[in-house]
């Protein structure tokens, strides 16, 4: 579908000026007349480009501190005018056709994200003329090209060169889709911001800022189509947020291997988010969204070796995450020892990638280093609705722990307790984690009763010949009965860390004292469903 339209006149008005000088120079060199506004016009003029201010073109000045610039019939008539149909009326009113509109909008998201942003600041960064021009041009895409992304500048110039200064309808239609997506996302941000202030007009208190908007508008960009979803009869795609600020599976670069599956992405996310909890060199192995082995050590090679020993059977076909660069020695250990679906790390050495390349199906992802966790929202889809909550970024320090048993934990028990507490946060509830000397030795996940999770963790440790005596046990939620403590004591657990908060806490603590177990309360729960 060709239907080319020549670009003879373009209107440029951008807040993000990245690449705009070079793009304007390229347009001007190809004989395109340039119209512009405000700061964009001044910038282009400073660079020696022939540019006409919109106010000079319309005969109407910018006014109200720039609130009114482009809202004029000579601008919108030039954009919306249908070639071959509205020519006479345009000529009668001295309206020149505008063939290309280059606009990006006031930085509303960046403004409201700044600490101390007032309602007045936010209001002044709501673009009016920009979205109006974008929508006008997108509506009239049969005749007009609308450009909202600087990443499209080079491709547009190349196509114009290939088509004697014209753009095809296919290109204009694709640009129009991007434009409508752009304005939809922009309006959604504004609606979410104002909606979170309801019912107070100046809803800038901490209480108001914590409210969820009354209408939740979400915008995600499709990154890839999947072969299928969780199961082969389900269709699926992977969508990501724009401008993600934290290293994640969404921003990771795949440097090797076949395409990621739906389950690969879900499990890789679980592994990466868990390994982020640790400052020391760490390895997390995940299977079906649950950690099956976690360890920290002085090197990632030793961390991997210890994590693998937790449950070699479950590690087969798993996802492996590191919080340090993947090196050749560790890559060789993985490839020689097990079948792995995905390896993700902040980076990988060239030597490591040469080794993993021997297994063509192994997917290797690099996600970059992370500094700190970024607050955000978690979503859970239910039939007919969406559950929304803050991300679980809750952490406890050693100083915040409460020892409620008669016996105090030893230094090693305390270290192991804090270690397995971090792991338990990422295990499906009911979650029980046994750990000793900075490695998991048994994990009980997803059981309907907590005592069975405790028993399963003990069984797994015994199956692998791992010594439970003197280990720590973490529980993601309180023990409703003493049976979980009795089960742990039976296999040799000597320290328990849990939130506390049961009406039977006294009975549970008494059980710990009977068995000589040190018990620590965190006063924080980590359910994961």
From Swiss-Prot:
So what family is this one in?
Belongs to the PurH family.
Pathway assigned to this chain's UniProt record: Purine metabolism; IMP biosynthesis via de novo pathway; 5-formamido-1-(5-phospho-D-ribosyl)imidazole-4-carboxamide from 5-amino-1-(5-phospho-D-ribosyl)imidazole-4-carboxamide (10-formyl THF route): step 1/1; Purine metabolism; IMP biosynthesis via de novo pathway; IMP from 5-formamido-1-(5-phospho-D-ribosyl)imidazole-4-carboxamide: step 1/1
Q: Which Pfam families match?
A: AICARFT_IMPCHas, MGS
Q: What is its EC number?
A: 2.1.2.3, 3.5.4.10
Sorted alphabetically, which InterPro entries does this protein's record hold?
AICAR_Tfase_dup_dom_sf (IPR024051), Cytidine_deaminase-like (IPR016193), MGS-like_dom (IPR011607), MGS-like_dom_sf (IPR036914), PurH-like (IPR002695)
* Keywords (A to Z) from UniProt: Hydrolase, Multifunctional enzyme, Purine biosynthesis, Transferase
Query: What are the GO cellular component annotations?
Result: cytosol
Q: Which residues form the MGS-like domain?
A: 1-148
Q: Per the record, what are the reactions this protein catalyses?
A: (6R)-10-formyltetrahydrofolate + 5-amino-1-(5-phospho-beta-D-ribosyl)imidazole-4-carboxamide = 5-formamido-1-(5-phospho-D-ribosyl)imidazole-4-carboxamide + (6S)-5,6,7,8-tetrahydrofolate; IMP + H2O = 5-formamido-1-(5-phospho-D-ribosyl)imidazole-4-carboxamide
The molecule here is called Bifunctional purine biosynthesis protein PurH
Domain comment, as recorded: The IMP cyclohydrolase activity resides in the N-terminal region.
Enumerate the GO terms in the molecular function aspect. IMP cyclohydrolase activity; phosphoribosylaminoimidazolecarboxamide formyltransferase activity
Chain ranges passing through the membrane? none
Cysteine pairings via disulfide bonds:
none
């Amino acid at each position: 579908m060709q239907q080319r339209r020549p670009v003879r006149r373009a209107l440029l008005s951008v807040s993000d000026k990245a690449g705009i000088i070079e793009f304007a120079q390229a347009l001007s060199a190809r004989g395109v007349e340039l119209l512009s506004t405000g700061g964009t016009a001044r910038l282009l003029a400073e660079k020696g480009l022939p540019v006409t201010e919109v106010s000079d073109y319309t005969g109407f000045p910018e006014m109200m501190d720039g609130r009114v610039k482009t809202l004029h019939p000579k601008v919108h008539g030039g954009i919306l005018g249908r070639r071959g149909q509205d020519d006479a009326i345009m000529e009668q009113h001295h309206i020149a056709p505008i063939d290309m509109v280059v606009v990006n909008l006031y930085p509303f998201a960046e403004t409201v994200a700044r600490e101390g942003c007032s309602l007045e600041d936010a209001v002044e960064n709501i673009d009016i003329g920009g979205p109006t021009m974008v929508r006008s041009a997108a509506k009239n895409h049969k005749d007009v090209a609308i450009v909202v992304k600087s990443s499209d500048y080079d491709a547009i110039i190349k196509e114009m060169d290939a088509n004697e200064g014209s753009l095809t309808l296919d290109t204009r239609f694709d640009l129009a889709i991007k434009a409508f997506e752009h304005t939809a996302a922009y309006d959604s941000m504004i609606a979410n911001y104002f909606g979170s202030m309801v019912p107070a007009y100046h809803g800038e208190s901490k209480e108001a800022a914590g409210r969820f908007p009354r209408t939740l508008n979400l915008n995600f960009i499709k990154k890839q189509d999947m072969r299928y979803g969780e199961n082969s009869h389900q269709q699926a795609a992977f969508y990501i947020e724009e401008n993600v600020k934290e290293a994640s599976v969404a921003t990771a670069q795949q440097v090797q291997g076949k395409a990621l599956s739906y389950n690969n992405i879900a499990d890789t996310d679980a592994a990466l988010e868990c390994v982020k909890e640790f400052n020391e060199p760490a390895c997390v192995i995940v299977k079906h969204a649950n950690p099956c082995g976690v360890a920290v050590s002085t090197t990632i090679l030793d961390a991997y070796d210890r994590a693998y020993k937790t449950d070699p059977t479950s590690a087969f076909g798993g996802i492996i995450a590191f919080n340090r660069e993947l090196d050749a020695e560790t890559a060789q250990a993985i490839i020689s020892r097990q079948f792995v679906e995905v390896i993700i790390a902040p980076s990988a050495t060239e030597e490591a990638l040469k080794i993993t390349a021997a297994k063509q199906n192994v997917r290797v992802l690099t996600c970059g280093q992370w500094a700190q966790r970024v607050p955000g929202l978690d979503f859970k889809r239910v039939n007919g609705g969406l559950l929304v909550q803050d991300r679980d970024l809750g952490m406890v320090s050693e100083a915040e722990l409460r020892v409620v048993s008669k016996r105090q934990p030893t230094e090693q028990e305390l270290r192991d307790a804090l270690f397995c507490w971090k792991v338990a946060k990422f295990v499906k509830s009911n979650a029980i984690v046994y750990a000793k000397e900075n490695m998991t030795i048994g994990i009980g996940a997803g059981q309907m009763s907590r005592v069975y999770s405790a028993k399963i963790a003990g069984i797994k440790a015994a199956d692998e010949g791992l010594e439970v005596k003197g280990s720590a046990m973490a529980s993601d939620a309180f023990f409703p009965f003493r049976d979980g403590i009795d089960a742990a004591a039976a296999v040799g657990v000597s320290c328990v860390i849990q939130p506390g908060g049961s009406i039977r806490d006294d009975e549970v603590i008494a059980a710990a004292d009977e068995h000589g177990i040190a018990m620590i309360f965190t006063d924080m729960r980590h359910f994961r469903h």
